């Protein structure tokens, strides 16, 4: 059992529903009634619950009763025994029954000890030959070597360790088991007082053992992941869909992989075994590969991705992406205008990414039945995380990526106070009007028409004032002076819109701006104001941070006063932790803005598409005053021109990504929370893939899937196809893809 090949299918729950034969999976839990509840309690407290998680049925039987004598072990796929003592009535006969059971395909897990070293009659005791008839089938050889010893060092297989804070200070039993099989995995190894190493827990495809009080630590914590142990024993032919990263830690790469929800290992140096990984991502200064392990991995069909700099340095104005990487609009380009160090393509390599000046930035070359992909590490920036993922995943024989599939459109700073100002940008286009007239008689009606035309939802971010007050008194005179604001609020309340909040004013909720008592006071004041202006039934679920800035202090104070807030809007362009899609508090998610403004259309399209590549989402913000904001309308475009731009943007997104679902921010928050907290488990063989979700997940869940061969789906359906990219909706707890 190679540890990188056989991976436990975390939450293989409901897998039994996929085949009628799997419904028969059943375990037998054995204990001795004479031990006054020892084995019985262990079986019910620790073993049975893990079997239930896997929907494995079980029987619990006292091995010292007639019930056991009348039981056929062959009716069970797994036998788990747990005994404290070594005495057994008719011990040899018991060992022979275990031997016959294993020889006929059964699997045995021994907890504590085999329980039949001595015949309770006092005569006819088993010898090493009888004991090893069972142990040898499990892959070990046993000798009489029992002793008590205080552990000097306890090593637990990291892939099976149930808790990272285990304690082993007390004296414990140890006994020697020599591995004779090539497919045995040590679970727990103990260096005892004699400085010898003892294998006190191990696992093989046929069974295993967790010996002599090493199931629990000194504090009663379970030491090994029993669900995984049982999963490997029963479903051992499967492996996790998993990636390997080799090299120094890289934040952008780690976040890009985290957002895929896929399993990955990260090691500073190359391990000797690579089997079982769908791809190896190698952070290296050079592209030359002289490592035999990597070369053999590629020759056998593996994919190696080299992330490095290179010998060529050029300023890249734009990056061009084709539909071979990801479905993109016609003439799609990513504005970059940065220096990039990259490696010239190798002879006979295939081009993946180019610049607008025809520089080959990323390429791949076939090696044996596998491939080498080169990607310049200078392009591994936050905005381009999704581009890296899609470049790599588009080249794998089979790839799958969970995605959110939800986007929201925000009317930021709306409804907003107005001041009856006559602004040049407005009077030039519309004549003698004020900002009040523009916001509420031109901009808002046209935005409503836009929503009607494209069938989109708006989440607004209401701001009451633009004053700079951070100390008492807190008043709402600006709102009172703008009667149109109250009218618009009521219209939003009565219509199909979501009213989010921006705050009492536009001062970000940070420790540097507010004292704790003043912030608490202004938030309570704003809450009372909302009740007075709207109604008692109105509850804000969305908060958009002014200037997209909030810190942990501000978020904590906000949620104290507004505990129902489920979405906090920031910006993806920032570098702090609150600029990432994440969960804070009990059930609040940070939803950073990925796209904003009306133009350039190519820029807002590329920002959105890059976000769709990364997570299957984008968050789009516009403001009522964008038209006369010098930083947001640097080209002094008219409102008519900007309105045409936003129509072009939305129509393009809907044309090329019709599978994307539009939601209010609060609705999207629920989806993102589920996405971030209820991770699917993805496992596969050469012929099929299983995607299993935790219980009580909301459906559907969505995935990008690529496969180089035909497939069928049960438990899900295809909702979109473009070239070799399939968008899949999972509709059941378990989705099965058969190739």
What are these regions (language model features)?
Residues 115-153, 242-247, 298-300, 307-318, ...:
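Metal-dependent polysaccharide deacetylase catalytic core of the NodB/CE4 family, i.e.
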Residues 288-290, 722-739:
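C-terminal beta-strand-rich structural cap/linker in extracellular carbohydrate-active enzymes
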Residues 29, 36-122, 244-312:
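Helical hinge/lid and interdomain linker segments adjacent to catalytic or ligand-binding clefts
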Residues 87-163, 286-353:
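A glycine-rich, often tryptophan-bearing local segment used as a flexible ligand/cofactor-contacting loop or short
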Residues 25-27, 42, 107-108, 163, ...:
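A glycine-centered loop/beta-turn motif at secondary-structure junctions
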Residues 380-490, 495:
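Active-site beta->alpha N-cap acidic-glycine motif
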Residues 376-379, 396-419, 451, 589-671:
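Catalytic grooves of carbohydrate-active enzymes
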Residues 666-710:
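Surface beta-strand/loop "capping" patches
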């Amino acid at each position: 059992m190679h540890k990188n090949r056989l991976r436990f299918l975390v939450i293989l729950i409901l897998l039994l529903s996929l085949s009628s034969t799997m419904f028969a999976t059943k375990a037998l839990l054995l204990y001795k009634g004479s031990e006054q509840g020892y084995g019985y309690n262990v079986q019910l407290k620790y073993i049975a619950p893990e079997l239930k998680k896997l929907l494995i049925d079980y029987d619990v039987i006292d091995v010292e009763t007639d019930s056991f004598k009348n039981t056929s072990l062959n009716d069970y796929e797994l036998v788990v025994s747990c005994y404290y003592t070594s005495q057994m009535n008719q011990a040899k006969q018991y060992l022979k029954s275990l031997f016959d059971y294993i020889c006929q395909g059964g699997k045995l897990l021994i907890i504590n000890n085999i329980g039949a070293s001595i015949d309770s009659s006092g005569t006819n005791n088993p010898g090493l030959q009888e004991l090893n008839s069972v142990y040898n089938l499990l892959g070990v050889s046993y000798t009489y070597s029992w002793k008590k010893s205080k552990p000097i060092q306890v090593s637990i297989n990291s892939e099976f360790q149930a808790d990272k804070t285990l304690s082993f200070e007390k004296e414990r039993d140890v006994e020697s088991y020599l591995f004779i099989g090539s497919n045995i995995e040590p679970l727990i190894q103990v260096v005892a007082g004699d400085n010898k190493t003892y294998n006190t827990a191990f696992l093989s495809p046929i069974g295993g053992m967790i010996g002599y009080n090493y199931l629990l630590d000194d504090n009663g914590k379970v030491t090994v992941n029993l669900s995984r142990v049982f999963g490997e024993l029963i479903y051992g032919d499967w492996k996790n869909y998993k990636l390997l990263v080799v090299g120094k830690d890289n934040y952008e790469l780690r976040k890009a992989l985290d957002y895929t929800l896929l399993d990955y290992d990260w090691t500073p140096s190359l391990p000797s075994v690579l089997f079982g990984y769908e791809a190896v991502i190698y952070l290296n200064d050079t592209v030359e590969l002289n490592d035999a392990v990597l070369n053999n991995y590629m020759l056998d069909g593996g994919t190696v991705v080299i992330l490095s700099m290179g010998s060529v340095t050029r300023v890249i104005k734009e990056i061009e992406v084709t539909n071979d990487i990801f479905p993109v609009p016609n003439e799609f380009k990513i504005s970059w205008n940065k220096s990039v160090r990259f490696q010239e393509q190798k002879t006979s390599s295939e081009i993946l990414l180019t610049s607008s000046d025809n520089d080959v930035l990323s390429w791949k070359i076939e090696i044996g039945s596998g491939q080498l992909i080169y990607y310049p590490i200078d392009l591994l920036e936050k905005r381009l995380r999704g581009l890296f993922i899609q470049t790599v995943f588009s080249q794998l024989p089979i790839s799958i990526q969970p995605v959110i599939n939800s986007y929201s459109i925000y009317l930021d700073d709306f409804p907003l106070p107005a001041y009856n100002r006559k602004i040049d940008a407005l009077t030039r286009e519309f004549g003698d009007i004020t900002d009040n007239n523009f916001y509420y008689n031109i901009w808002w009606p046209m935005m409503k028409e836009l929503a009607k035309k494209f069938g989109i939802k708006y989440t607004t971010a209401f701001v009451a004032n633009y004053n700079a007050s951070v100390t008492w008194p807190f008043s709402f005179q600006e709102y009172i002076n703008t009667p149109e604001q109250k009218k618009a609020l009521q219209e939003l309340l009565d219509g199909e819109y979501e009213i989010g909040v921006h705050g009492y004013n536009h001062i970000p909720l940070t420790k540097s701006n507010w004292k704790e008592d003043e912030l608490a006071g202004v938030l309570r004041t704003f809450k009372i104001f909302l009740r007075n202006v709207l109604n008692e039934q109105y509850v804000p679920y969305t908060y958009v941070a002014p200037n997209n800035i909030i810190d942990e202090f501000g978020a904590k104070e906000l949620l104290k006063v507004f505990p129902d807030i489920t979405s906090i809007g920031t910006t993806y362009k920032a570098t702090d932790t609150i600029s990432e899609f994440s969960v804070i508090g009990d059930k609040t998610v940070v939803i950073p803005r990925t796209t904003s403004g009306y133009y350039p259309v190519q820029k807002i399209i590329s920002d959105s598409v890059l976000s769709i590549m990364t997570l299957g989402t984008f968050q789009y913000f516009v403001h009522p005053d964008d038209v006369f904001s010098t930083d947001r309308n640097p080209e002094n475009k008219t409102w008519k021109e900007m309105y045409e731009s936003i129509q072009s943007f939305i129509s393009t997104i809907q044309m090329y990504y019709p599978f994307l679902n539009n939601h209010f921010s609060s609705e999207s928050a629920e989806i993102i929370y589920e996405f971030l907290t209820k991770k699917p488990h993805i496992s596969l063989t050469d012929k099929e893939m299983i995607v299993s979700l935790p219980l009580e997940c909301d459906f559907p869940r969505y995935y990008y899937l690529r496969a180089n061969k035909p497939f069928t789906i049960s438990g899900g359906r295809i909702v979109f196809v473009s070239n070799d990219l399939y968008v899949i909706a999972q509709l059941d707890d378990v989705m099965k893809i058969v190739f």
